[in-house]
């Protein structure tokens, strides 16, 4: 009957939309970061370098994590990517989803003080029942080196 044909068409269209929505969430994207961990600077020249790494993982792997320091974007990290940034004075870091696939993903932020030391941050994804958000946590140098 006509009703069955209409119902089949609706199901086909919804399957297509569901697949279209899931592909960016489940696939792994490359960002602007490096897959190679940066060399950690040990010279105490008064500069503060902040080091970021994005955890590996399946959930949210297709969504790039946009990193902003003091309102300026410094990179978009895919899973297992790294980026560094030099700062002076107090700084504020904000992590959010990049692009259309990042729309609706929760954000996280953290603050720090540039005091001539290196600081290390791990970016992750926390999944709730009906939501997902990026997280940022400060770690030690050894925690950073062991991440992934």
List where the protein language model places each region.
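Bacterial N-terminal signal peptides that target proteins for export
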Residues: 7-17
């Amino acid at each position: 009957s006509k009703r069955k044909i209409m119902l089949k068409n609706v199901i086909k269209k919804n399957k297509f939309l569901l697949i279209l929505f899931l592909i960016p969430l489940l696939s792994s994207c490359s960002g602007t970061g490096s897959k190679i961990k940066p060399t950690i600077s040990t010279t105490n020249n008064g500069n503060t370098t902040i080091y970021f790494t994005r955890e590996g993982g399946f959930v949210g792997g297709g969504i790039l994590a946009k990193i902003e320091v003091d309102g300026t974007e410094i990179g978009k990290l895919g899973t297992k990517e790294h980026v560094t940034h030099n700062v002076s004075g107090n700084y504020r870091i904000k992590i959010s989803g990049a692009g259309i696939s990042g729309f609706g993903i929760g954000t996280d932020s953290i603050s720090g003080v540039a005091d001539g030391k290196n600081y290390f941050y791990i970016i992750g994804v926390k999944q709730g029942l009906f939501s997902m958000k990026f997280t940022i946590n400060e770690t030690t140098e050894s925690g950073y080196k062991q991440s992934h």
